[in-house]
Design a protein with these regions (language model features):
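N-terminal beta-strand motif that seeds the catalytic metal site of vicinal oxygen chelate
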Residues: 1-19, 74-83, 129-158, 202-205
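A mid-sequence, solvent-exposed acidic-amphipathic segment
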Residues: 140-190
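Intrinsically disordered, low-complexity segments enriched in Gly and acidic/Ser/Thr residues
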Residues: 172-206, 210-216
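Conserved catalytic-core motifs of GNAT/GCN5-like acyltransferases
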Residues: 29-36, 105, 169-173
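An N-terminus-focused feature that recognizes amino-terminal "leader" regions
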Residues: 1-9, 15-47, 52-58
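Amphipathic alpha-helical segments
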Residues: 16-29, 89-96, 153-169
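A structural feature that tracks compact, well-ordered secondary-structure segments
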Residues: 54-58, 80-84, 92, 98, ...
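Vicinal oxygen chelate
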Residues: 90-143, 179-189, 213-251
């Protein structure tokens, strides 16, 4: 059974720079990190509210993460759904004709993991994971709220994610320009291609900060630009961040 969105994967050029941003500047607790030579990456998982952020950097030029970085630059790489039995989930998907990158689960930083092929998910990269343990997450100054994505057909993509992962449909624009999906409080917000994004993929993260002014001060002290808008702060992609961030105030 798929229970929740476990984490969002963000690709950066250098993991140390990524940790400097996510751990040191945003003050997210580091849960664990590891070199994964069989996957050609270094990775770190950080707590972020009820979810987690996985920061990935390539260690070999032929890894999937390296290819992503070469073609798209730093950015949001994947969304991971937690299952209580990823082996069963993979068998179910294969049995119903869903294309998988991993025909069998393998060990990853989040536990036993398997990636669904993007062609089965509206060209979005999705991971399944069964964590090896389920310790309570520490309190964090920021919480992951939503992942923004661009797709070719918003309605079809939303239906596919509902069918595969049991996501709940929320607000949807009548003209098909926006659909909001959720699972245990975390949201995916889908819009059509455009606005500088010619290919389907995840484009930005929305976070919530308990103290928005303190975050703005920390960003300023480290020379990281941010802009205020009606929602809160917008942090453009920069070294280590890996993705545009939209940060709103609230608990």
């Amino acid at each position: 059974m798929i229970a929740r969105i476990h984490h969002v994967g963000v690709v950066v050029q250098d993991l140390d720079a990524g940790l400097e941003f996510w751990r040191d500047t945003l003050e997210l607790p580091l849960l664990r990190s590891a070199d994964l030579p069989d996957q050609g990456v270094r990775a770190a998982l950080l707590a972020c509210g009820t979810g987690e952020v996985e920061v990935l950097a390539p260690t070999t030029p032929d890894s999937g993460v390296a290819r992503f970085l070469a073609s798209r630059g730093e950015g949001v790489h994947h969304v991971c759904f937690e299952s209580d039995d990823v082996v069963r989930e993979v068998r179910r998907f294969i049995g119903t004709g869903v294309d998988m990158i991993d025909g069998k689960p393998r060990q990853g930083l989040a536990g036993k993991v398997a990636f669904v092929h993007p062609r089965a998910c509206a060209k979005l990269l999705v991971e399944l994971a069964t964590p090896s343990g389920r310790a309570p997450l520490p309190e964090t100054p920021l919480a992951l709220v939503a992942v923004h994505g661009k797709v070719e057909d918003v309605g079809a993509a939303a239906q596919r994610l509902q069918d595969l992962f049991g996501m709940n449909r929320g607000f949807a624009a009548e003209d098909g320009s926006f659909v909001q999906l959720s699972l245990t409080g975390l949201m995916l917000q889908l819009t059509p291609l455009g606005g500088g994004f010619p290919k389907p993929g995840f484009t930005a993260l929305r976070l919530r900060a308990g103290d928005l002014s303190a975050l703005a001060r920390r960003l300023g002290e480290r020379g990281i630009p941010c802009q205020e808008n009606a929602v809160g702060l917008v942090v453009p992609p920069g070294p280590g961040a890996g993705a545009p961030l939209i940060v709103e105030a609230g608990r």
